[in-house]
Amino acid sequence: MTDSIAAPAAATDKLVPFRHIFLTGGSGYVGRNLIRHLVARGVAVTALARSDASAKIVEALGAVAFRGDLFESTLAAGMAGCNALIHAAADTNHGPATEKQRRVNEEGTRVVLDAARTAGIAKVIHLSTESVLATGRPLVNVDETMPLPPKPAGGYSRTKAEAERIALAANGPDFSVVVLRPRFIWGRDDTTALPTLLEAVRSGKFAWISGGNYLTSTTHVANLCHAVELALGHGRGGEVYFISDAEPVTFRAMVSALIETQGFAVPEKTVPRFVVRTVATIGDVMAKISGGRVVPPLTLQAYATSAVEVTFDIGKAQRELCYTPVISREEGLAELRSAQHR
């Protein structure tokens, strides 16, 4: 689908002060929606594209493709004429830690920021994740003052936390870097999380963890795009902001609603939390001692994402970015149902 799900732009929209933006991760779920959102507001977007297929995707959405990857030697030249960078590219694998993930998330962030500075870019939005705080224990209404944990849940949390440190360390008087942390990104045109969820339902592998009756924050992709726009205009360099749909919801209610929008019956099977935690812990150990040759069915990283409460306070984004969701959870679910029946 190529139509935008972001909030419509006003005729005299002044929230985006930057007229030419360089985007990494443009062919991904969030990246595609960011291109639609920004192009609709008259912003020129140059998107990094690793392949011909990725280039076709971003060009079809109205961006100019710059062929290469995060480590492209001509990256700074590709950013010429841009005055802002949105760094959305990441290896989001929740499996065992890998060197590839470390290189993409950590070194890739450093290289992209260095290129942006060389190109004279003034503002950077670094898309992070609430998973930088994940350890496997509940995160209950936390805010940005919570420190990064010394022992994160897994490779994704560890490398994204280090990417945050790299991004924030790069902030300076002439190079403003703002970090956004969304949680549970969802919405129309999802080609990653929702299809994976539905495949688990189809195959009979889906099960609730302790019934799924724990709270979670969520972030509709249109709300994330809106937050990026606000952060470009109002975000303070060197600061981190949580972004969500505002009110939390139980994990079971949210996932059930997503499944139902696609015409599937919601499974009832449930597994005790301690069993899932044990399987995840053993899986991590087996992957480590086998040097990655054993691929576990579950990791502590995946457990930390889906088995415990994860909610946070978005008061800082509301105060400093003037952020408020532009689409409600009910509207987003209705949009998914409508798209399914077209």
Regions found by a protein language model. Give the residues of each.
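Substrate-positioning beta->alpha
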Residues: E162-A163, T191-T196, S210-L232, G238-F242
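N-terminal Rossmann NAD(P)H-binding glycine-rich loop of SDR-like oxidoreductase domains
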Residues: I21-R41
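NAD(P)H-binding glycine-rich loop region in Rossmannoid oxidoreductase-like domains
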Residues: A53-E59, A63-E107, V111, A115, ...
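Glycine-rich Rossmann NAD(P)(H)-binding loop
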Residues: T24, G187, I209-Y214, Y241-P248, ...
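Amphipathic terminal alpha-helices
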Residues: T2-A11, H20, F312-E320, T324-R342
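Mid/C-terminal beta-alpha module of Rossmann-like enzyme folds, strongest
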Residues: L230-P296, I314, E330-R337
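Conserved Rossmann-fold NAD(P)-dependent oxidoreductase catalytic core, especially the SDR/UDP-sugar
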Residues: E107, V111-G155
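Catalytic helix-loop patch of NAD(P)-dependent Rossmann-fold dehydrogenases
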Residues: R103, P138-I185, F206-W208
